[in-house]
């Protein structure tokens, strides 16, 4: 009988027939999901000789949800993910204007998915702008709920922003706003709790995966108390909770200014194993790193709360409406995110089957259009069928 995944004593409890919700996604979501689901199902069947099976449960979000329910993110969808703990999703459209914030950000904040985890690695055969892309093998831990993504801001010229500026000037003696009459104002919250839980998760991940170096990426040279606090609290976590690992040489923790980090990932990417970043810096760095190994079409991602067990694994690219329903999209982002999901629930054998099949497909010079670069471009279904045949 199919059962929901639950958290007991800090550990996920996963039956042989777990219920896992999925959100198909908008745009190319339909093309990539129908192929990805077939690959997930076969990998599980082969890896466990038919003894395990995922019971997929479709949830609505994005344009598909709006067309059917009049809501972009139905409460039922949020509640189903809360109850099931683990879910996977395709790309979601967010309408421009109308006061509706990013659906992806809404999901992360509503479920307190504080860690955005993005493993970035190179696959042989994939075109890259780097001479030695194989040196790039970095896992990003991006804080997911704070920073400017909290959405606390006021528009220039409004009564609200005038009140904020007046308060800053009269009550806080702030005199550094260059053009107070025409400025928009935003607030950047960075908390001790938010920073420490993110950095603790990054360190735990490094130790679990036998990775030694954890690097704190920040702009503490300019923003002393927010970005600088992130750096300070990261070192505190290491000293308070991981002193034994530090003394034994199993863990090294260091830090780097964000702009220097963006240089070093090009010049010396092998210097980094796991990196922890604030939200905005993590946004920049994750897409920059993805470009080094072939682009976001092959970049997986997960949004995780390691304390509650809640996790959403997702395609990291957009909806690409220009190629929707044309069987052209690259399914690898959602496939590799699915591998992260399988690893997360302990089904590593199935994840390894898919990863290995993708590696062999690339080595055989079989690519979708975004990675072909003058070579023959394969359709989504043809590319996926090649993976299925290898498994």
UniProtKB/Swiss-Prot annotation:
Q: What does the record give as the reaction this protein catalyses?
A: D-threo-isocitrate + NADP(+) = 2-oxoglutarate + CO2 + NADPH
Tell me the disulfide pairings in this chain: none
Entry EC number(s): 1.1.1.42
Task: Alphabetically list the UniProt keywords.
Answer: Glyoxylate bypass, Magnesium, Manganese, Metal-binding, NADP, Oxidoreductase, Tricarboxylic acid cycle
Q: Which residues form a coiled coil?
A: none
Q: Which InterPro entries match?
A: IsoCit/isopropylmalate_DH_CS, Isocitrate_DH_NADP_dimer_prok, IsoPropMal-DH-like_dom
GO process terms (BP):
glyoxylate cycle; tricarboxylic acid cycle
Chain positions recorded as D-threo-isocitrate binding sites: 102, 104, 108, 118, 142
> At which positions is Mg(2+) bound?
283
Q: Which cofactor does it need?
A: Mg(2+); Mn(2+)
- Return the annotated site residues (Critical for catalysis): 149, 219
* Record text on cofactor binding: Binds 1 Mg(2+) or Mn(2+) ion per subunit.
Q: Which GO terms describe its molecular function?
A: isocitrate dehydrogenase (NADP+) activity; magnesium ion binding; NAD binding
Which Gene3D superfamilies does the entry link to?
Isopropylmalate Dehydrogenase (3.40.718.10)
Task: Report the enzyme's class at the first EC level.
Answer: oxidoreductase
Q: Which SUPFAM superfamilies match?
A: Isocitrate/Isopropylmalate dehydrogenase-like (SSF53659)
Presence of the UniProt keyword NADP in the record? yes
Q: Which SMART domains match?
A: Iso_dh (SM01329)
Q: Which family does it belong to?
A: Belongs to the isocitrate and isopropylmalate dehydrogenases family.
Q: Describe its partners and assembly state.
A: Homodimer.
The role this protein plays is:
Catalyzes the oxidative decarboxylation of isocitrate to 2-oxoglutarate and carbon dioxide with the concomitant reduction of NADP(+).
Q: What is this protein called?
A: Isocitrate dehydrogenase [NADP]
Which gene carries the instructions for this protein? icd
């Amino acid at each position: 009988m199919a059962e929901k995944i639950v958290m007991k004593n800090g550990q996920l409890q996963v039956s042989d027939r777990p219920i896992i919700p999925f959100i198909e996604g908008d745009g190319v979501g339909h093309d990539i999901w129908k192929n990805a689901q077939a690959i997930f199902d076969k990998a599980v069947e082969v890896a466990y000789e038919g003894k395990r099976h995922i019971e997929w449960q479709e949830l609505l979000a994005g344009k598909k949800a709006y067309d059917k329910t009049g809501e972009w993110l139905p409460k039922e969808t949020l509640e189903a993910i809360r109850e099931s703990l683990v879910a996977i999703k395709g790309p979601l459209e967010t309408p421009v204007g109308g006061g509706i914030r990013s659906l992806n950000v809404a999901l992360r904040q509503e479920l307190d998915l504080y860690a955005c985890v993005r493993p970035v690695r190179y696959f042989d055969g994939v075109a890259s702008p780097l001479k030695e892309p194989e040196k790039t093998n970095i896992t990003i831990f991006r804080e997911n709920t704070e920073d400017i993504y909290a959405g606390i801001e006021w528009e220039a010229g409004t009564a609200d922003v005038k009140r904020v500026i007046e308060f800053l000037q009269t009550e806080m003696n702030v005199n550094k706003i260059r053009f107070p009459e025409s400025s928009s104002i935003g607030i950047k919250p960075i908390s001790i709790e938010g920073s420490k839980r993110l950095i603790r998760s990054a360190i735990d991940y490094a130790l679990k995966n036998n990775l030694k170096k954890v690097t704190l990426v920040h702009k503490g040279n300019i923003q002393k108390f927010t970005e600088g606090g992130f750096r300070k609290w990261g070192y505190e976590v290491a000293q308070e909770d991981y002193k034994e690992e530090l003394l034994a040489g199993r863990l090294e923790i260091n830090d780097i200014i964000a702009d220097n980090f963006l240089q070093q990932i090009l010049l010396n990417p092998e210097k980094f194993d796991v990196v922890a970043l604030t939200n905005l810096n993590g946004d920049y760095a994750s897409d920059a790193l993805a470009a080094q190994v072939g682009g976001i079409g092959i970049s997986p991602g997960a949004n995780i709360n390691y304390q509650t067990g809640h996790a959403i694994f997702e395609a990291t690219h957009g909806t690409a409406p220009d190629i929707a329903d044309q069987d052209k999209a690259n399914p690898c982002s959602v496939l590799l995110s699915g591998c992260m999901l399988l690893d997360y629930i302990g089904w590593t054998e199935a994840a390894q089957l898919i990863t290995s099949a993708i590696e062999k497909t690339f080595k055989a010079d079989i690519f979708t259009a975004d990675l072909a670069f003058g070579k023959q471009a394969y359709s989504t279904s043809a590319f996926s069928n090649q993976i299925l045949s290898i498994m």
